[in-house]
């Protein structure tokens, strides 16, 4: 069983119980954990973030204290689940932060629901295929932007 210093809340959405932690007040930050993890991934940052933001850290379906049904476990399915959770909580827009597999879900959420995405932050993200990785490496290489400015 997951132990958390924060009060775990539950909502039943489409017949499945979803666990999440909600702390703080202000603009909403949605924290998405990696595969095989849960909301406790974010314990070290929830306290400091909740001083300025409303932090929502769910246990993705199939993880932690959330139900583990036969369901759609694709990144699109998880993105839809986050949209549904936020809708039930009355939240319109979020800064979505994803770690590892949660980064893939965060990117999919931002792609599917740009009107609900304030910012996207990736932490050691999964979901970046080989076709994306060289581009990210290139644009983060020192000197890339000045060289591109000279070429364009």
Cite the ranges covered by each PLM segment.
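Active-site loop/oxyanion-hole signature of alpha/beta-hydrolase fold enzymes
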Residues: 11-16, 21-23, 57-101
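Alpha/beta-hydrolase fold catalytic core
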Residues: 1-29, 51-53, 91-92, 127
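Residues at the starts of beta-strands that form the adenosine-phosphate
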Residues: 54, 93, 116-119
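Glycine-rich His-Gly loop
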Residues: 31-34, 100, 125
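Conserved catalytic-core motifs of eukaryotic protein kinase domains, centered on the activation segment
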Residues: 41-43, 66-72, 131-134
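Conserved HGGG/HGGXW glycine-rich cap/lid loop of the alpha/beta-hydrolase fold
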Residues: 16-65
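Flexible "cap/lid" loop of the alpha/beta hydrolase fold
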Residues: 107-112, 117-151
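Short, hydrophobic alpha-helix immediately C-terminal to the catalytic nucleophile
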Residues: 43, 83, 107-111
């Amino acid at each position: 069983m997951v132990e958390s210093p924060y009060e775990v809340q539950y909502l039943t959405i489409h017949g499945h119980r979803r666990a999440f932690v909600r702390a703080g007040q202000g603009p909403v930050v949605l924290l998405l954990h990696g595969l095989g993890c849960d909301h406790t991934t974010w314990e070290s940052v929830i306290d400091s973030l909740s001083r300025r933001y409303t932090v929502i850290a769910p246990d993705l379906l199939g993880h932690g204290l959330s139900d583990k049904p036969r369901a759609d476990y694709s990144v699109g399915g998880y993105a839809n689940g986050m949209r549904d959770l936020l809708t039930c909580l009355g939240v319109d827009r979020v800064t979505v932060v994803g770690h590892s597999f949660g980064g893939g879900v965060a990117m999919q959420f931002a792609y599917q629901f740009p009107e609900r995405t304030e910012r996207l932050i990736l932490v050691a993200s999964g979901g970046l295929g080989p076709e994306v990785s060289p581009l990210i490496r290139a644009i983060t290489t020192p000197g890339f932007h000045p060289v591109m400015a000279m070429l364009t």
